[in-house]
């Protein structure tokens, strides 16, 4: 990293870690020793190289054994940190509770550690005189099932995220601490990673020394069933798709399907121009056993898809834009990075104020590039956009909570289930953020007479300094300045009114769709995208009629705030038993809603929740309602232009 880029973060870190003595004055911990202040990180090389040897062969118990050797240069108190603020997660999610049997020795003698009482991911030890290194060992107890966390090891594959299985010395920038890792895999397994391999013999991979900053950003997917696909043959820098699967048959991708993924790489090059990596590795798990994931890294990404992703791609609509989204993050989020997320260590809190760019614009470009590449048709993308427009345009939560505030959700909610999602709002900066960028794109196209677009912003903002992968921070003012260079406007007001508005000022975010030549309408049949997607997931949608969604067992999974179901006192968890005297099914529910249209006959529904039964009568008569985008005659099809593949 460039020192100037981290100056503000260094000052913040000094305030955070330097506050320890003051905190001690509030109350002294009842421990057998004094806690030393955690040193603020400094931009100086850590003396020596930390070795980390990982054994991931215990598949039955899913236990990973880790051994580290950490050089030290003097006696006295020392703090080792377990990463807490994991890049890409946008919150303090480092699972320190998964670490067990922590042992630390020096010169063969055990050293007793004590956990820091304020920064509980920190472990303090006393380095004895004459010691030149600490030997650290522990077990990473990975989840056995999903109730304990995301499953990262199965009998056929594993997902190593190094930052979940390491300790590092406090007091130094992550970019200034060097690790030398090795990984032992089960016999016969192969792997993909952005790390540079020095050797791989008898199941032991030895990787080149790397800074902690990049080490934590370079996970591994490994498995018994592995395939690597070149997505840019003869290109300027390698782009590879590393696939692991539950079964070897799941690796059977057809050449036309692979070509669509190659077109994704081509369309990204045409959009951005520059590349900010020396090689890029998609890590892809085709599995229903490994925990689901879509997580960006600078030179790789972690992705998991349905087991039919290659063998029956038409049945995996929900996975279509995943790789595109994570690939875009190499430019937006990893190379260009919000300044308040560019922290010097993995334990300093990040701030999320620009996630509507980091994630929102990535969501936008991910869907656009997926469509331009042909992985998604224009018709299906318009259906997806209709669902997004309906969800956020009619969100009851807009009455009280600004979209800007939702950037804090990864910190305050951490993706826990919500009782009333439509009112609480969640990580709306993804999809509503994408609507804002569609608004900006169509406005630029309209005002410039079609001569300029958000593509020009992408080229100017991300398409410079080709080959550089030193993070380049950005601020709100940088965004505004670049937009103004593309098409003059009061962009600060344009953006802030959309980000900060609540209540009566929170207009439905549909201007981009209408300026794009379409309008949101509701019809009695789901659009093709929604029909296919909900068929995959076993979901049934009556959100815009009765205000409920149900699963394949007729159990209500969500209730829309202020809907007929809400007014009737229903919540998620109720099972629909019967409708109008007939056994419940999605078809029966839909038929009852249709039969009540335009008359006064109520819809009678019997429901069960545990041992409780109740009957509800809905005085609803507007029929089934599903979102669609309808072409506005006589207007330019700017959405069509946006989604069309680029030829130069």
Please provide the spans of the model-predicted regions.
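Non-catalytic architectural context of zinc metalloproteases
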Residues: 44-46, 57, 63, 67-69, ...
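C-terminal recognition in membrane/secretory proteostasis and scaffolding
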Residues: 366, 376-648
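Ligand-binding face of N-terminal immunoglobulin V-set domains in extracellular IgSF glycoproteins
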Residues: 67, 77-82
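N-terminal, polar/Ser/Thr-rich
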Residues: 25-59
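Envelope-exposed proteins and targeting segments
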Residues: 48, 62-64, 100, 132, ...
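Extended catalytic-interface subdomain
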Residues: 328-330, 357-379, 388
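Gram-negative bacterial Sec-dependent N-terminal signal peptides
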Residues: 3-23
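Juxtacatalytic substrate-recognition/specificity segment
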Residues: 68, 230-355, 361, 365
